[in-house]
Curated annotation (Swiss-Prot):
Keyword terms, alphabetized: Membrane, Transmembrane, Transmembrane helix
GO CC annotations on file: membrane
Protein name: Uncharacterized protein L891
Entry membrane topology: Multi-pass membrane protein
Compartment(s) of residence: Membrane
Gene source species: Acanthamoeba polyphaga mimivirus (APMV)
Membrane-traversing stretches: 26-46, 70-90
Length: 104
């Protein structure tokens, strides 16, 4: 019974054989991406509040948070050595670049 339980725990913890604590690294990677997006969203929000008189209504401040969030998530993913985090972060960054180019 203990052998089976150990096998199930190993199966659950290692979707990709990168590190022994994959669930933890997924969590930190996702927190990194979300945290990066929230931090830059906060900066752009306060910037909009203080610069209400500015006339340029560009869409660049909408795709910058996703780009930097993806970048931060990628850095955290590389630091924790988890490949899915890096892939998610890179796709977020590329998606934000495409959105920026399309909105111009």
């Amino acid at each position: 019974m203990s052998l089976f339980k150990g096998f199930m725990i190993n199966l659950f913890l290692t979707p990709i054989p990168d590190s022994p604590m994959n669930l933890l690294t997924i969590g930190t990677g996702i927190i990194g991406v979300i945290g990066g997006i929230l931090v830059v969203k906060g900066f752009t929000f306060f910037d909009k509040c203080y610069n209400k008189n500015s006339t340029n209504n560009s869409n660049s401040d909408e795709c910058l948070p996703i780009f930097i969030g993806g970048l931060l998530g990628g850095i955290i993913g590389i630091a924790t050595g988890f490949s899915i985090t890096i892939i998610i972060a890179i796709t977020l960054a590329i998606k934000s670049i495409i959105n920026c180019v399309e909105s111009q």
